[in-house]
Every structure is written in structure tokens, then in C-alpha cells.
Amino acid sequence: MSRIAKAPISVPAGVEVTLKGQEITVKGKNGELTRTINNAVEVKVEENVITTLPREGVTDAWAQAGTARALINNMIVGTHEGYEKKLQLVGVGYRAAAKGKTLDLTLGFSHPVHFAVPEGITIETPSQTEVLVKGVDKQLVGQTAANIRAYRKPEPYKGKGVRYSDENVRRKEAKKK
């Protein structure tokens, strides 16, 4: 039995939730998100409270209800407040520059990397070594940040590469003679 599924979701002021069948739409000041909920889950929207309950006769219904509750909560937080991930570029000559819908990265390769920013994501570069990924969809923000990081993951000897701002890179000692 899922403890997460049992907790109701409170809808903040300024956020509008509509349910049509198994499709839930959340509108807020930052945008609009739509998601189809699993058939094993029954969603009820009453005034400013959303509850997720499992349907009878489905084996993993409680797990699906917990997942649906977490996804709906992420949609509400995203449309109300938004999500952001901060990346740092560590290394000599590593730079980032946001130009319209592309992010130009200089990461020590023989060529610059041009990253196409997906729809629904905004990228800012407060400095040449910092990248801010912002958006409404939590999954898309995290995936975009992971895609940027994948170009040059932090290496364990000098710590050079693209890392999350809160990431601790485990350092290794150099080989001794």
C-alpha cells in the first residue's frame, strides 16, 4: 500500500486543474501541462484538493496511484513555481553561451558543441561557466540538464567537466611511481 498515494494534493491559488477521463490538465502562471493517467488509478478533483485512489482488481494499483500522485504534484509545482537546474563548467577554456534557441559550449573538443534547446525550456548563462536550465516540466528540465552534462562528464582526477552545482565529484589520487 502506497503512503504517497494516500496523501491528498492541495491546489494553490492561481492554478486550475481539469480532468477529462484519464487526462489531467494543469494551468498556472508559468504555463500548461497535460498528462494521461494510468487506467489503474482513479483521480478525483474536488475544489482545491486532488486525491488519487487505486481501482479494484488491479495488482499494482497502489504503486500506480503513488506514481500518479507524484506526477500530478510535480505538474502543479511546475506550473505554479517552475523548476530549474544549475550546471557548472569546470576546466580551462570551458565556456557556455546561450544564443536564442541554441546553447554553444566550448568543452575542450576540436569543435564547439551546439546544443538545440527543446521546446518548453529556457536556458540562461549568468556567467561563462554557469548554465541555468529552467522550465515547467520537471522531467524535461532534468533530462535537458543531463543531456548537457553528458557532453563532458566530470572526470575523477582533476574534476574537469560539466557538473550539477550541488554535485560532489569523487576525486581519485594520481598513480604513484
UniProtKB/Swiss-Prot annotation:
Pfam families: Ribosomal_L6. Keywords: Ribonucleoprotein, Ribosomal protein, RNA-binding, rRNA-binding. One of its GO terms (molecular function) is structural constituent of ribosome. Residues 157-171 have a biased composition (Basic and acidic residues). It comes from the Bacteria. InterPro entries: Ribosomal_uL6-like, Ribosomal_uL6-like_a/b-dom_sf, Ribosomal_uL6_a/b-dom, Ribosomal_uL6_bac-type, Ribosomal_uL6_CS. GO terms for biological process: cytoplasmic translation. GO terms for cellular component: cytosolic large ribosomal subunit. Residues 157-177 are annotated as: Disordered. This protein binds to the 23S rRNA, and is important in its secondary structure. It is located near the subunit interface in the base of the L7/L12 stalk, and near the tRNA binding site of the peptidyltransferase center. Belongs to the universal ribosomal protein uL6 family. Part of the 50S ribosomal subunit. This is Large ribosomal subunit protein uL6. It comes from Pseudoalteromonas translucida (strain TAC 125). The lineage of its organism: Bacteria, Pseudomonadati, Pseudomonadota, Gammaproteobacteria, Alteromonadales. The gene is rplF.
